[in-house]
Design a protein with these regions (language model features):
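Residues forming the flavin
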Residues: 1-193
Length: 193
């Protein structure tokens, strides 16, 4: 998405996007708006009530819900993906393979907190069992972690968390009120096959 939005670089002409979250749909919309054909979005989830998948439906982008990519083909570059439907419990694939021609496969697994500097400074991590990522737990230094490095990814929640934690850290009582509008996003889902 950054290549096409910031630099105007098209990495492929026929794209398949594989995802477990709504953020990939923003990539699909960006590519579509720049003239790139989205062959399909392959989503392991059974559905999403987010705004971005709805927008992709409006644009006529094909969404394969509760599917996964099981194989790719190509020589020196990708030219095809094989897709299969997931079983009800997500433990296996079912039905026949669907083969989709493409010259680019985009993969979106969601967000992971950027904890590199935190751990380099001696900070300890904890694992979030619900969202499947490590995030800051404790540190011996006088520091705070907010936003994506703390596992907060919604813009509204990042601003609220930043204000609350900064005020606590600096012993401030003043609160600014911000009016933040963001699109509705569906949940992400992890899978282990």
């Amino acid at each position: 998405r950054k290549y096409i939005n910031y630099y105007g670089v098209k990495c492929g002409n026929n794209v398949v996007i594989f995802t477990n979250n709504d953020d990939a749909y923003e990539t699909a919309i960006s590519l579509h708006n720049k003239g790139v054909k989205i062959e399909a979005i392959v989503d392991i989830r059974s559905r999403s009530d987010g705004d971005l998948p709805k927008k992709c439906n409006e644009l006529g982008i094909k969404i394969l819900w509760k599917n996964t990519i099981v194989y790719t083909e190509g020589y020196k570059k990708i030219n095809k993906v094989h897709v299969m439907e997931l079983s009800n419990d997500n433990s296996s694939t079912i039905r026949n393979k669907l083969k989709i021609n493409c010259d680019l496969l985009c993969v979106s697994g969601g967000y992971t907190p950027a904890v590199h500097l935190f751990t380099q400074s001696g900070g300890k991590l904890t694992f979030n069992e619900e969202k499947y990522y490590f995030h800051p737990k404790s540190t011996s230094l006088s520091q705070i972690s907010v936003g994506s490095c703390n596992g907060t990814f919604s813009l509204k929640k990042i601003i609220e968390e930043t204000q609350t934690k900064t005020n606590e850290f600096l012993n401030l009582t003043h609160n600014n009120q911000y009016n933040i509008t963001e699109s509705k996003s569906g949940n992400f889902e992890n899978i282990w096959l």
